[in-house]
Amino acid sequence: MKIEHLSDHNVSQMNCYVFDTNIWLYIYGPMAGIQARKQRNYSNLLREILDHNAGLFITSLILSEYINRFLRICFDQWKSSNKLYNADYKSDYRPTPEFANSLSDVKAQVHDILSSCTARMPDDFHSMDIDSLVDSISQQADYNDIYLVRRCERKGFWFVSDDTDIESIPSGSLQLLKE
């Protein structure tokens, strides 16, 4: 695994990138502003990628994770601000105007994310060694992390992530870009 830090990386038109869900959350999510330095650095990387016409790919898995995580963060904030610590996501939160607002926000953000990406990466589920992926799941790395690492390895793409678990995944050819 090749690990490079943002400060040492030069974006090139020849490079292709995949942003992990946590990167999109720093840039667009409801926690944006909480870690302003990371938000700024990853937003700058996004701008550089777009300015250099480098490839920026996204998968359906990342979009699904983004939508679900965004809405769960909003749910947690709603529970806390309303002191409804035992509230249920589906029966208590979904019928609320707050959920409707969060849903509207996340849909708009997904459109922004998709417009930033140059292509949608097919998942190639039919050609992946799923047994090997499942066998690789550990206390440090979940299925989604391993799956995205393998996809980036196969394509030779830079994987941009702020998830320290990624480094625990055995990899010979992954190009990991982080803050």
Locations of regions flagged by a protein language model:
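Short, well-structured N-terminal submotif of metal-dependent ribonuclease cores
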Residues: 1-62, 69-88, 155
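Residues that cap or flank secondary-structure elements
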Residues: 37, 139-140
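Basic/aromatic recognition patch in beta-strand/loop cores that engages polyanionic ligands
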Residues: 66, 141, 145, 167
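Acidic, PIN/NYN-like endoribonuclease modules and their adjacent C-terminal/linker elements
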Residues: 1-12, 127-130, 136, 149-179
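PIN-domain endoribonuclease scaffold, especially VapC-family toxins
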Residues: 44-57, 61-138
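Alpha-helix capping/helix-boundary segments
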Residues: 23, 62, 147-148, 165-166
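Histidine- and aromatic-rich ligand-binding microenvironments
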Residues: 19-20, 58-59, 140-143, 163, ...
